[in-house]
A protein has these predicted regions:
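Extended aliphatic helical segments
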Residues: 6, 14, 19-23, 60, ...
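Short, extreme N-terminal leader segments that mark the start of a protein/domain
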Residues: 1-46
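Long, charged alpha-helical interface segments
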Residues: 160-187
């Protein structure tokens, strides 16, 4: 998986035990700040040029999903984790796909310079990093640490929650952990 690698229709490449990371880029952000483009540049992801190129059965990270990502989804992770790179201001343009497993990330804080400290406004690389940890692929997630200078701060801000989410048995337990955490910070 090098720079410029592009997925063909329905293809997902698993290297060893690694989860394929797939980017669908709507080219809406500043290319110099775009974490999706950096993931592609550093060989951390492959690009799906069209929605048709997104592998069937893959996990699509979606803010509109009805289920939270959990370790139980690791079976779908083998088909890939897909991040749709578009700006939060254009979130209504988020595509709805069939034949994929839409999952929402649980409560996490952004650590990137644009949205630092904002809950649930992660950039594409933060979303993938969190997904890999929740799905039990810590070693693969470590590959992101040296490529994004905010990554250690992301782990500092969210480490305990990520560990709790990664130890949950299913989506409902992830949601319970999330809700307990949110209740604890409200009081």
């Amino acid at each position: 998986m090098g720079r410029g690698d592009v997925l063909r229709s329905g293809e997902a490449q698993v290297i060893g035990n690694m989860i394929p990371v797939i980017v669908y880029d709507k080219n809406q952000c500043d290319p110099k700040k775009c974490t999706a483009k950096r993931m592609l540049k550093f060989g951390l992801a492959k690009e799906a040029k069209t929605l048709h190129n997104i592998p069937s059965g893959s996990i699509v990270l979606s803010p509109f999903a009805e289920r939270a990502l959990s370790p139980a989804d690791s079976k779908f992770g083998r088909n890939g984790v897909v991040v749709m790179d578009l700006t939060w201001t254009n979130i209504d343009e988020f595509p709805r796909l069939s034949k994929t497993q839409d999952r929402a990330l649980p409560y996490l804080l952004a650590s990137n310079p644009i949205n630092w400290g904002r809950p649930m406004e992660l950039n594409s690389a933060e979303a993938v990093l969190a997904s890999l940890i929740i799905l039990g692929e810590k070693e693969q997630a470590e590959g992101f640490m040296g490529r994004f200078n905010w990554a250690p701060e992301f782990i500092r801000l969210n480490g305990e929650l990520l560990e709790a989410y990664a130890s949950a048995k299913d989506s409902s337990e992830v949601v319970r952990i999330q809700n307990e955490y949110i209740d604890s910070i409200k009081s």
